[in-house]
């Protein structure tokens, strides 16, 4: 029987209807966060899709020293707390160091470990100590079966609820490719698997001083992943992605999200029919 992670009234499992994890790449301010959250809550309620709000207080791995990193942990958590209380939605955000875990866990329901840091034992242990759900993004440099080692670490540290996320694998320079087999391979570890449809179309460092991306393939990859049978879709959105401070070339336009989700629900239903 596949593992099911429970978060409030949401059940996350590979055999269950998919959960949507979405929001803007980084927190841009209180007004913007509340605007995005309101739109997303209304849309997911209308479509009856379980929803978890995601946004980052710090983009610590920007390509360039001049890249906009975000509002910082103190202001960021304050804004996420406001989103959580105003819209009664769960929160996931990423942590980049052991020192951030305890403070972040006061607001976030899920701690996300970035792909570049997925093997950092001390960070995994610090996240584990919070007692929160730990969501790990598979490194672009890792084989899917190597996530077993990450799982073993987290379980050794006492984590009961683990989520894994596929976000593409390095394919030469400045390019990623999505191997849909990895979703099934990680699911065999009895861990709910999420597909990151927007970061999977990244072209890391592809613009020289920043990361490029191919937004036009987000829907295609999301359909393919949903057809495999997964626990969740992770998809960053923005009302004006071309002018967003980070990951603009990858993020979906908010106005296009509804039509994509309607299609994904159909794929998901067919795949999971008994």
UniProtKB/Swiss-Prot annotation:
Intrachain S-S bonds: none
Any GO MF annotation of the entry: 3-deoxy-8-phosphooctulonate synthase activity
CC per GO annotation: cytoplasm
GO BP terms in the entry: keto-3-deoxy-D-manno-octulosonic acid biosynthetic process
UniProt-listed InterPro entries: Aldolase_TIM, DAHP1/KDSA, KDO8P_synthase
Catalytic activity: D-arabinose 5-phosphate + phosphoenolpyruvate + H2O = 3-deoxy-alpha-D-manno-2-octulosonate-8-phosphate + phosphate
Location(s) in or outside the cell: Cytoplasm
Predominant subcellular localization, coarse grouping: cytoplasm
Keywords: Cytoplasm, Lipopolysaccharide biosynthesis, Transferase
EC assignment: 2.5.1.55
Enzyme class: transferase
Annotated pathway: Carbohydrate biosynthesis; 3-deoxy-D-manno-octulosonate biosynthesis; 3-deoxy-D-manno-octulosonate from D-ribulose 5-phosphate: step 2/3; Bacterial outer membrane biogenesis; lipopolysaccharide biosynthesis
Keyword Transmembrane annotated: no
Gene3D superfamilies registered for this protein in UniProt: Aldolase class I (3.20.20.70)
One Pfam family this sequence matches: DAHP_synth_1
Family (UniProt): Belongs to the KdsA family.
Name of this protein: 2-dehydro-3-deoxyphosphooctonate aldolase
């Amino acid at each position: 029987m596949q593992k099911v992670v429970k978060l409030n009234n949401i059940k996350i499992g590979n055999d269950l209807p998919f959960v949507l994890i979405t929001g803007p790449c980084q927190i841009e301010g209180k007004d913007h966060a509340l605007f995005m959250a309101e739109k997303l809550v209304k849309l997911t309620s209308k479509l009856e899709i379980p929803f978890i709000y995601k946004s980052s207080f710090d983009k610590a791995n920007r390509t360039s020293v001049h890249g906009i990193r975000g509002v910082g942990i103190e202001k960021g958590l304050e804004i996420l707390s406001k989103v959580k209380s105003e819209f009664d939605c769960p929160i996931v955000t990423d942590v980049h160091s052991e020192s951030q875990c305890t403070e972040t866990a006061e607001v976030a329901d899920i701690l996300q470990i970035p792909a570049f840091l997925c093997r950092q034992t001390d960070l995994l242990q610090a996240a584990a100590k919070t007692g929160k759900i730990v969501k790990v993004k598979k490194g672009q440099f890792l084989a899917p079966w190597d996530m077993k080692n990450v799982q073993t670490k987290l379980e050794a540290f006492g984590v009961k609820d683990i989520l894994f996320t596929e976000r593409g694998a390095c394919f030469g320079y400045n390019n990623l490719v999505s191997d849909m087999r990895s979703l099934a391979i990680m699911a065999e570890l009895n861990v709910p698997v999420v597909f990151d449809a927007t970061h999977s179309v990244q072209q890391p460092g592809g613009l020289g001083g920043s990361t490029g991306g191919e937004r036009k393939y987000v829907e295609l990859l999301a359909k393919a992943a949903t057809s495999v049978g997964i626990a969740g879709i992770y998809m960053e959105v923005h009302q004006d992605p071309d002018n967003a401070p980070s990951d603009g070339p990858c993020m979906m336009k908010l106005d296009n999200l509804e039509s994509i989700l309607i299609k994904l629900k159909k794929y998901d239903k067919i795949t999971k029919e008994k």
